[in-house]
């Protein structure tokens, strides 16, 4: 019976270790897939947005301008197209580095309705970019390693830069 108990204990320990390894690997794969999805959506959005319109929004800072509305509509379409059962984009926005304030970003264009409690007007601080260490990855396609937690909840976030036609960094799309 001692041999039988030893074999059962060995089998249980082996099973627990195997299941733990499978769980860790599955979690890692799911996290990688989420990173890939949010980054792909951010890159798609960055390629769809017209940099000249963004430059006009930066100059005018008017949420009622044609350029703002056109850019907002592009973001809304991308957001709405990515609201599916297996992936749900809650927010998509464009943020602008704050002048003379390293590591700080402000909202430039938000896909949310202007009447929504979640709408972020031009110039509002985008604090999630600080916690995501976006300034360290400003000109890169980037997704923080872990879920970000902010006032709106817990998120997987992806960022992609938008460049001018001559290759200069302009702003960043966040998903």
Segments and roles (model prediction):
Residues 1-25:
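Extreme N-terminal signal-anchor transmembrane helix of membrane signaling/transducer proteins, especially
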Residues 7, 21-47, 62-66:
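Juxtamembrane membrane-water interface segments immediately C-terminal to a transmembrane helix
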Residues 20, 101-112:
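Amphipathic coiled-coil signal-relay and dimerization helices
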Residues 68-79:
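Short amphipathic alpha-helical segments
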Residues 80-106:
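Short N-terminal helix-loop-first-beta-strand/juxtamembrane motif that initiates sensory/input modules
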Residues 110-148:
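Extracytoplasmic/periplasmic sensor domains and loops in membrane signaling proteins
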Residues 142, 152-161:
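A short beta-strand signature within small-molecule sensing/ligand-binding domains used
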Residues 158-175:
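Short, hydrophobic beta-strand elements of compact beta-sandwich sensory domains
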């Amino acid at each position: 019976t001692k041999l039988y108990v030893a074999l059962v204990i060995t089998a249980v320990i082996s099973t627990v270790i195997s299941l733990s390894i499978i769980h860790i690997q599955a979690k890692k794969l799911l996290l990688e897939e989420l990173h890939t999805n949010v980054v792909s959506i951010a890159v798609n959005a960055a390629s769809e947005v017209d940099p000249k319109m963004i430059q006009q929004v930066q100059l005018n800072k008017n949420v009622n301008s044609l350029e703002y509305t056109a850019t907002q509509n592009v973001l809304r379409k991308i957001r709405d197209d990515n609201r599916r059962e297996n992936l749900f984009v809650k927010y998509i926005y464009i943020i602008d580095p704050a002048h003379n304030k390293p590591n700080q970003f402000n909202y430039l264009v938000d896909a949310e309705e202007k009447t929504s409690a979640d709408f972020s007007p031009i110039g509002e601080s985008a604090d999630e970019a600080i916690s995501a260490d976006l300034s360290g990855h400003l000109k890169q396609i980037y997704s923080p390693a872990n879920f970000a937690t902010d006032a709106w909840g817990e998120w997987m976030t992806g960022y992609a830069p938008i460049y001018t036609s001559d290759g200069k960094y302009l702003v960043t799309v966040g998903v």
